[in-house]
A protein has these predicted regions:
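Amphipathic alpha-helical interface segments within eukaryotic helical scaffold
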Residues: 1-8
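Eukaryotic intrinsically disordered, low-complexity segments enriched for acidic and Ser/Thr/Pro residues
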Residues: 2, 15-149
Length: 149
């Protein structure tokens, strides 16, 4: 969920006029695709937690939302991410299984995606402004601190 938020803020930053000039024109669609893909993967993994808790209705809602997001991500461009179609197939198979379980056993009403609880976020990185690196020719290289002199 945090990765989705980072890509969303990166996309918002890329749409600013001062940043648009410094970036290749194909970057925003790729970032938009990745944002949708990571959001879809977060929903897929959250659906697995719902499955473990026997919350079939929420599981189905999250899987349907994940399918929508993964499909949108594929349409926008995967940006070099592999196995995206495989994740979409896994999502579709899990959705079929959850629907069968719900139809035969639980008979629960599927909640709307807007009513789903937000997925907890875990910060894993610190965002850097685009212009801090791209706009300053004197800025240290991206990997300069990782390489010993």
């Amino acid at each position: 969920a945090q990765c989705d938020e980072y890509f969303s803020s990166a996309l918002t930053s890329m749409e600013k006029e001062e940043d648009k000039k410094q970036l290749p024109s194909d970057w925003p669609p790729i970032v938009a695709g990745k944002q949708a893909l990571y959001s879809g993967l977060a929903q897929y993994h959250q659906s697995k937690l719902c499955s473990e808790k026997n919350a079939v209705a929420e599981e189905m809602a999250r899987l349907e939302y994940a399918k929508t997001l993964l499909t949108a991500g594929i349409e926008r461009g995967t940006g070099g991410l592999r196995n995206v179609k495989e994740w979409l197939q896994r999502t579709e198979q899990a959705l079929i299984k959850a629907r069968k379980d719900n139809d035969f056993i639980y008979h629960e009403r599927i909640p709307e995606k807007q009513s789903l609880a937000a997925i907890e976020k875990s910060p894993v990185a610190k965002p850097t402004p685009l212009t801090a690196r791209l706009g300053n020719p004197d800025a240290p290289g991206l990997f300069e601190l990782l390489v010993t002199p």
